């Protein structure tokens, strides 16, 4: 049996993994659970790991795997994602849940449109191209997808590196804390964490060397959210 906070954290991690394939950062977990410090997150993670609900993947930053779900929990609260939605500024539309797709055969390959480069640093223009990228269908869920090549290092703490291919599910809505492709002022595209703050849109990097970027809601259009990553080793 888990405590309320342990159950909330486990649910939050599972939801983020299902949505983006990437574990949430300790900062995101701290904010989602309304904790005062990251040490509280560390204690919850350790407790879940000791009880066999999650495990940390070796040699990978921010890599958590959910092993099982609890049968019951103490003081079960509303899922964190619901609390986030309740606190979301209405300047941008809320997330619409996408249907779950049936698992694709492991040997199926889909040719995704490769729309040039996207910045993981200062925004750069998203280049259109007729190129495609072969992607295992098992990496993709429901919906329409496209690929962008990552340029820059501002998302390295999220495990996204220069030269990676971002696999993006087309959508114009997203929750706070999700990694999105944001079109800024109709000209530049960037890959960042999305947050809404005091009537503004904040695009957060995952690199302490970069500062958050603030824009008016009408200056930012969500064009997709991160569904996965593809990395080539040469």
Curated annotation (Swiss-Prot):
Gene name per UniProt: lexA
Family statement drawn from the similarity comment of this UniProt entry: Belongs to the peptidase S24 family.
Function: Represses a number of genes involved in the response to DNA damage (SOS response), including recA and lexA. In the presence of single-stranded DNA, RecA interacts with LexA causing an autocatalytic cleavage which disrupts the DNA-binding part of LexA, leading to derepression of the SOS regulon and eventually DNA repair.
Protein name (record): LexA repressor
Compositional bias segments (type: Low complexity): 91-100
Enzyme Commission number, as recorded: 3.4.21.88
Reactions mediated catalytically: Hydrolysis of Ala-|-Gly bond in repressor LexA
UniProt cross-references to CDD domains, sorted A to Z: S24_LexA-like (cd06529)
DNA-binding region: 26-46
InterPro entries per the UniProt record, alphabetical: LexA, LexA-like, LexA/Signal_pep-like_sf, LexA_DNA-bd_dom, LexA_repressor, Peptidase_S24_LexA, Peptidase_S24_S26A/B/C, WH-like_DNA-bd_sf
Residues of the active site: 154 (for autocatalytic cleavage activity), 192 (for autocatalytic cleavage activity)
Region ranges (Disordered): 73-100
Complexes and interactors: Homodimer.
Source species: Novosphingobium aromaticivorans (strain ATCC 700278 / DSM 12444 / CCUG 56034 / CIP 105152 / NBRC 16084 / F199)
Gene Ontology biological process: DNA repair; DNA replication; negative regulation of DNA-templated transcription; proteolysis; SOS response
Record key words, sorted: Autocatalytic cleavage, DNA damage, DNA repair, DNA replication, DNA-binding, Hydrolase, Repressor, SOS response, Transcription, Transcription regulation
Site, Cleavage: residue positions: 120-121
Disulfide bridge positions per record: none
Molecular-function GO term, any one: DNA binding
